[in-house]
């Protein structure tokens, strides 16, 4: 991962001073879901590629702006150094992890981050640790590492004009990198069963047996362009093998587009009908995904209405859990 040579702060000290409250969230500008999660909590956010690059300057700026709580979202490079600086500076510190235990067991990078965070918490460098994935905080606490459930808030979408993607078949978005847990290849297999359909992707997997599919590869898009594209398709697929509290499905439903998910997060689970309509149990079965997608598209208006109602009900819960976490 390349590190920026110069600080990449997106907020000035003056803007921080205008903030209500005493909390500053920090995130990596290129980690899209984590970034949107940070902004979902409404407070000031600092984006940086390397949290250690000017840690002393960040801490001093926070003090000048009367921001006394630092929340690191997703643990960007340099977070350990920044958190130690914050501790020395008398600030209260928090870390929110957006990974799952499944990732900790298979991804060396995520494993190292989780172990580092728990070690820093044991040393008193981090005052509270949170997980956006429901069920993990209880497990870590049982293992001797006190943790809290801190789900993401509901994002806010700016108005946009939908793109004209064509009316010659179902336009389906799979906006995830082809990593093992994102399950992109399986979902492309499902799209073959939805024909006529066109897939819209970030990056096409290298499997040559997929070459007959109609695919548009869009690459990594700026956030506003991504939201516009995601909100212009007929259906989005987010059928991953491991998930935490994904933001893309929420953005999709806010834009009026149904999104099929796996049952690896607790999104919509409190509404049994919505859960049944918007999720699929067999995440590694393209036929099951295609069948669930067909059923979802047939009831897209009901799904969108129920999802938006769910978000309206859930957001105060997320806000309350966040306030408890940062207090």
Language-model features, listed with the residues they occupy:
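Conserved donor-binding/catalytic core segment of Leloir-type glycosyltransferases
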Residues: 162-182, 188-192
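Active-site proximal beta-strand in glycosyltransferases
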Residues: 69-71, 86-105
């Amino acid at each position: 991962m390349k590190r920026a040579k110069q600080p990449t702060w997106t907020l000035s000290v003056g803007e921080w001073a205008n903030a209500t409250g005493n909390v500053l969230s920090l995130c990596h500008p290129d980690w899209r879901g984590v970034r949107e999660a940070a902004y979902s909590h409404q407070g000031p956010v600092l984006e940086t590629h390397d949290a250690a690059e000017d840690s002393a300057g960040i801490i001093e700026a926070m003090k000048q702006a009367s921001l006394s709580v630092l929340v690191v979202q997703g643990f960007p490079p340099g977070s350990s150094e920044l958190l130690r600086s914050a501790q020395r500076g008398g600030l209260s510190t928090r870390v929110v992890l957006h990974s799952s235990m499944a990732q900790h067991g298979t991804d060396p990078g995520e494993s190292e981050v989780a172990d580092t965070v728990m070690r820093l918490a044991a040393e008193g460098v981090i005052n509270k640790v949170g997980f956006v994935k429901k069920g993990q905080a209880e497990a870590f606490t049982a293992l001797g590492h006190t943790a809290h459930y801190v789900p993401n808030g509901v994002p806010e979408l700016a108005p946009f004009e939908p793109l004209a993607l064509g009316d010659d078949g179902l336009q389906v978005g799979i906006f995830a990198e082809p990593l093992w847990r994102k399950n992109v290849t399986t979902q492309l297999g499902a799209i073959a069963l939805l024909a006529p359909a066109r897939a819209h992707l970030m990056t096409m997997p290298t499997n040559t047996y997929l070459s007959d599919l109609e695919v548009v590869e869009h690459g990594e898009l700026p956030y506003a362009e991504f939201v516009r594209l995601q909100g212009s398709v007929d259906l989005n697929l987010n059928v991953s093998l491991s998930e935490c509290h994904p933001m893309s499905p929420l953005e999709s439903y806010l834009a009026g587009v149904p999104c099929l998910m796996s049952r690896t997060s607790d999104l919509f689970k409190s509404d049994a009908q919505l859960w049944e309509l918007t999720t699929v149990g067999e995440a590694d079965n393209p036929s099951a995904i295609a069948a669930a997608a067909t059923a979802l598209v047939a009831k897209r208006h009901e799904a969108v209405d129920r999802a938006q109602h769910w978000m309206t009900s859930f957001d105060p819960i997320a806000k309350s859990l966040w306030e408890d976490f940062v207090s």
